[in-house]
């Protein structure tokens, strides 16, 4: 495949953008803050890396305003690895997204991990040629983001905690709401669309497919190979790992183990071998201990 052919494949119409997102299915996407970390992620088998100024655990600890990563660092990461490079922009900050698109990132994450820029609106992602990924806690949030042009959805979870419980909650919430659509009449689906504030066309499509119209990855608190396998068993199309890699005792071993766990998520014996000797995971914090006003998952609507 030539460079130009790949450019056409990853950017463009909604169909092409969704197709590029689908190409990451079954893989692990890792948060990185430096070219060196990006290289570790690639060598471990990550399908893509996510560039940001600091991993969520550090952003949570530091407080203040969290913004997109320095474009120079993003460019260095792009130049360092051969796998796709994604980067985070603040909710509603379309200029950050435009800058990242101009840099040549493969996907933009309109992320609640960063400090939201717009208290009213998310980015109109249909105006971009680069695909977007967005977080969601329930079916309404997921379909609203897809209606805005998101090519991939991920659970919000509670980033930077190392506690997978919220990612589990959000994955089960979305899937439960999708199952509840089965067998409903058109009139009943219209009522559901009103209740969850989502376009009826997307509700009907989701009901027919019995899954989201785009890939749905797990994110937010995945910290061990077992966590990654759990999310795959629950129906995730792939896994984002943020602080769980580079806050672990041995990032290189943890990165490789998480990738292997996703590849062998339905094989307990293999998972047992994969999990041996990887070192301690990130210390983390229980998501239940975080006040609602400080929960990152509450950002966006």
UniProtKB/Swiss-Prot annotation:
Recorded protein name is Pyridoxal 5'-phosphate synthase subunit PdxS
Q: Outline the subunit composition.
A: In the presence of PdxT, forms a dodecamer of heterodimers.
- Looking at the record's lineage, which domain of life comes first? Archaea
Q: Name one GO biological process term.
A: pyridoxine biosynthetic process
Q: What is its EC number?
A: 4.3.3.6
Enzyme class, spelled out:
lyase
Protein family per UniProt: Belongs to the PdxS/SNZ family.
Q: Which organism is it from?
A: Methanosarcina mazei (strain ATCC BAA-159 / DSM 3647 / Goe1 / Go1 / JCM 11833 / OCM 88)
The entry marks the following residues as binding D-ribose 5-phosphate, namely: 31, 160, 221, 242-243
Which gene holds the coding sequence for this protein?
pdxS
Q: Which GO terms describe its molecular function?
A: pyridoxal 5'-phosphate synthase (glutamine hydrolysing) activity
Q: Which CDD domains match?
A: pdxS
The residues responsible for catalysis, as annotated, are: 88
Q: What does this protein do?
A: Catalyzes the formation of pyridoxal 5'-phosphate from ribose 5-phosphate (RBP), glyceraldehyde 3-phosphate (G3P) and ammonia. The ammonia is provided by the PdxT subunit. Can also use ribulose 5-phosphate and dihydroxyacetone phosphate as substrates, resulting from enzyme-catalyzed isomerization of RBP and G3P, respectively.
Q: Which annotated residues bind D-glyceraldehyde 3-phosphate?
A: 172
PROSITE patterns according to UniProt: PDXS_SNZ_1, PDXS_SNZ_2
> Pfam families recorded for this chain?
SOR_SNZ
